[in-house]
């Protein structure tokens, strides 16, 4: 079974051991966008992934292998625990945090300091910037975060049970 996780859609493909024809299922991953807010609920995405996989014939039977791939959109599922999502994940194009990258750059002493320290200068679309925005604007949610996973990593974690 293969899951390909994109922001606009999620694809599941299952191929039987003796079958030469993949059975795909494709559907929207469910991002919510309004008033500059672009986010998705990872639990809804998981429901879509498992639904697509069942439709393609991949869940409900023994699998020999599973592969999860994803497009790097620089956002993360914020987790309180392995099963509890803190809030919908901010997408790269969410416009609520235009100053968050500038704030982070200033806190470390400028772009050159960032480049020297970690090899990258924060931009608004990075998970790091999302985390800074969350700490400033939703401190109660930020305090709950125990882990951050990119979407395809979160799906792999959910599929593996660990």
Swiss-Prot record:
Signal peptide: none
GO molecular-function terms, A-Z: ATP binding; D-xylulokinase activity
Sequence ranges of Low complexity compositional bias: 20-33
InterPro entries: ATPase_NBD, FGGY_Carb_Kinase, FGGY_N
GO biological process: D-xylose metabolic process
Enzyme Commission identifier(s): 2.7.1.17
Protein name listed in UniProt: Xylulose kinase
Family: Belongs to the FGGY kinase family.
Group of enzyme by EC: transferase
TM ranges: none
Domain of life: Bacteria
Function in brief: Catalyzes the phosphorylation of D-xylulose to D-xylulose 5-phosphate.
């Amino acid at each position: 079974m293969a899951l390909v996780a994109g922001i606009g859609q999620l694809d599941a493909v299952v191929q039987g051991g003796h079958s030469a024809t993949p059975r795909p299922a494709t559907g929207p991953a469910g991002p919510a966008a309004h008033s500059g807010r672009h986010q998705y609920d990872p639990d809804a995405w998981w429901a879509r992934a498992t639904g697509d996989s069942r439709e393609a014939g991949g869940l409900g039977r023994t699998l020999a292998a599973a592969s999860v791939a994803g497009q790097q959109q620089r956002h993360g599922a914020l987790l309180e625990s392995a099963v509890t999502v803190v809030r919908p994940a901010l997408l790269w194009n969410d416009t609520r945090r235009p100053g968050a990258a500038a704030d982070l750059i200033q806190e470390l002493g400028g772009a050159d300091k960032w480049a020297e320290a970690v090899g990258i200068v924060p931009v608004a679309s990075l998970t790091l910037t999302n985390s800074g925005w969350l700490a400033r604007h939703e401190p109660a949610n930020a305090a709950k975060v125990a882990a951050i996973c990119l979407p395809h990593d979160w799906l792999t974690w959910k599929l593996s049970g660990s």
